[in-house]
């Protein structure tokens, strides 16, 4: 079970009920739902949108707020939220059109703080599309088809983009 799965597992108790209440117009339930989702959305948006991660997370939460009625199955909440967050993060990162110069915040450190810092430095130098695919495949652990669906690209495009992103990451790592 990866870090995200563990966080989802501990945070999901009662969320389907909150979703249904929010869909029914309960503003308190909506506020509680958005509060529960905010850290997850921020973890997804940060590594992709970098210094604009907070803006991307806010835009994603707004989309969740305005579109909650479109979620057909409350049990699919995290998958639905993940799609929204990733798309917003990529959109915001592309819109920025500038090199990221601030620290990447939400890459989990596994043991060695220097290694985590080095990984953040390399990710900072990658294009938003490359960061997105690396986060989804290598941090989130999603399969190629799910990633291609989330990024609205063909499976072949996702596979080649992942290959290029990993190659670019290795090149930057070796610098």
Predicted ranges, named:
Residues 3-6, 23-31, 42-59, 155:
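Short, charged helix-capping/linker segments at alpha-helix termini
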Residues 66-73, 83-103, 112:
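Arg/Lys-rich amphipathic alpha helix in sigma70-family domain 2
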Residues 6-7, 96-124:
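Acidic, proline/glycine-rich intrinsically disordered inter-domain spacer in sigma factors
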Residues 33, 37, 41, 45, ...:
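Residue-level preference for hydrophobic side chains embedded in well-ordered alpha helices
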């Amino acid at each position: 079970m990866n870090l995200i799965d563990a966080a989802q597992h501990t945070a999901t108790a009662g969320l389907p009920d909150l979703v249904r209440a929010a869909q029914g117009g309960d503003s308190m339930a909506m506020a509680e739902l958005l509060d529960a989702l905010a850290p997850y959305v921020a973890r997804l948006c940060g590594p992709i949108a970098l210094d604009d991660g907070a803006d991307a997370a806010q835009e994603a939460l707004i989309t969740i707020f305005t579109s909650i009625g479109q979620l057909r199955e409350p049990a699919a909440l995290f998958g639905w939220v993940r799609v929204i967050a990733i798309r917003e993060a990529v959109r915001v990162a592309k819109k920025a059109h500038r090199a990221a110069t601030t620290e990447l915040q939400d890459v989990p450190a596994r043991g060695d703080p220097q290694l985590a810092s080095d990984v953040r430095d390399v990710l900072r130098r990658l294009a938003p599309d490359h960061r997105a695919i690396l986060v989804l495949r290598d941090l989130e652990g999603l399969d190629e088809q799910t990633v291609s669906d989330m990024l609205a690209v063909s499976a072949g495009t996702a596979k080649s983009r992942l290959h290029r992103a990993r190659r670019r990451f290795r090149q930057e790592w070796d610098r």
